[in-house]
Amino acid sequence: MSHAGAIAALGVALIAAALFSAIHKIEEGHVGVYYRGGALLTTTSGPGFHLMLPFITSFKSVQSTLQTDEVKNVPCGTSGGVMIYFDRIEVVNYLISSAVYDIVKNYTADYDKALIFNKIHHELNQFCSVHNLQEVYIELFDQIDEDLKLALQKDLNLMAPGIIIQAVRVTKPNIPEAIRRNYELMESEKTKLLIAAQKQKVVEKEAETERKKAIIEAEKVAQVAQIKYGQKVMEKETEKKISEIEDFAFLAREKARADAEYYTAQKAAEANKLKLTPEYLQLMKYQAIAANSKIYFGQDIPNMFMDSSSAGPRVQSAKRNEPAAAEELK
């Protein structure tokens, strides 16, 4: 009885072990692949619990979501013969679920070692071998990430379609200590040079600002001088116009005065012409004789007041008798 119980217990244990090995779980973001007798089965499974033949069938879970593969301590020799080391290179990639079977069949479940790790070593050494230390360490370092990504993706598209490289991140390489110190010194000198260049630019900018300020001041002075000159010109033109107006007014006054004098003389001449009558001439004659202060003697004195036709001979006779009259007075 005890023997039968032991057999039954053993059977239960075997059945439990078989069930335990037959039931397996696939995590979300993974694809299950199966091996039977070392041969890869075409059957794949998604996330969840699944059954398989116990003991003779095994499975592996292959990640199909984004994953980061790290390649560490990659040696690299430059074209100048300097050996440098990249501490860590990160490759962000993912595997398309439909391509899991083909990838695992051709490159096993550890496909990343053959397709990514080895390819990173190869591409980095190819890159370093055609560039010197200055280019790898400084000038072209920012291009290494993109160059590695493109080279990896190009080869994977040919060898293993279904693996997508999203990004590659490369850390700064380690270089020999002596060279590193030289680069640090060079960077320090470059920084000093940049600072000096910036200071020079600041000085040039200040000088340019001062020059522009001086130009503005000079233009302001020139504009003020031009305005003052314009004002003086306007004042002179105003004075000239005032002088012209005064000259014109003076000329007009003089012309008016001359015209008035001419008119007065003309009218006086016309009046005199009208006055030249025999009676007026006789009156003037008498006035002239009356105004004469000399005293005439002789018999012709009364005749001086006769008419003008006999005045001439009488006057001549009076002049002839004037010396005799003067003698008598003595």
Curated annotation (Swiss-Prot):
Residue intervals on the Lumenal side: 24-330
Gene (name only): erlin2-b
Record topological domains on the Cytoplasmic side: 1-2
Entry's transmembrane regions: 3-23
Region called Disordered, residue ranges: 308-330
Functional note: Mediates the endoplasmic reticulum-associated degradation (ERAD) of inositol 1,4,5-trisphosphate receptors (IP3Rs). Promotes sterol-accelerated ERAD of HMGCR. Involved in regulation of cellular cholesterol homeostasis by regulation the SREBP signaling pathway.
Alphabetized UniProt keyword annotations: Cholesterol metabolism, Endoplasmic reticulum, Glycoprotein, Lipid metabolism, Membrane, Signal-anchor, Steroid metabolism, Sterol metabolism, Transmembrane, Transmembrane helix
GO molecular function, one term: cholesterol binding
Protein name stated in the entry: Erlin-2-B
UniProt biased composition (Basic and acidic residues): 319-330
Glycosylation sites: N106
Record-linked InterPro entries: Band_7, Band_7/SPFH_dom_sf, Erlin1/2
UniProt GO cellular component terms: endoplasmic reticulum membrane
CDD domains the record matches: SPFH_like_u3 (cd03406)
Family: Belongs to the band 7/mec-2 family.
Gene Ontology biological-process entries: cholesterol metabolic process; SREBP signaling pathway
Provenance organism: Xenopus laevis (African clawed frog)
Its membrane topology: Single-pass type II membrane protein
Signal peptide: none
